[in-house]
Amino acid sequence: MPRWPSDYQTGCIRERFIRENICLIDSVIKFSKANNVPGLLLFLDFEKAFDTLEWPLNRKTFQYFGFSQSLLNWLKVFYCNSENCILNNGWASNFFELNWGVRQGCPLSPYLFILSVEVLTNAIRHKKEICGVIVKDKEIKLSQYANDMTLILDGSEESFLESLKIIDYFGKISSLRLNSKKTEALWIGASADWDFKLCPEMAKKKQSER
């Protein structure tokens, strides 16, 4: 399925590999340092990503990408109005309905998730107020491997704040929320000219290094 996810996404797609993400981020860091270009990397972590994704977003995303109605009907059969139970030491709980999330271990789950997150990817890519790091005339804004996303920003306050706005809005329509304890930021290249208010621990570290 290489037609739909952007080139930034390498998870679960044939002929795309996680090493591409590592090489991309490493190249951006080295370029920023060598050319004294400011930049900010945001390593995003979504809370229980596969378990909380909203099904309505799945359906609308598949419609947007032009999947057939027949496939949409099958997805509805597999995921909508289904009942589940919990097995524990041979004991089965009562059945209950699930109205969100994609099943762990289901072969469809990675693709359902990737295509839904593509909504966030496109929003960031096309938002003019969000600027990435320009390497050899090519602007790089993000790197993705399934639910692991790294934003590659130019270090400006505007890019950072606009990114948070889009992520917050996406969270409202998808039920995906950032895990602030696991989301991390890393300055690269030249120092930024604004205070990083989100992470006070980072600000303290920056002050102690001066």
Predicted features, each with a name:
Residues 1-210:
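Nucleotidyl polymerases of mobile genetic elements and RNA viruses
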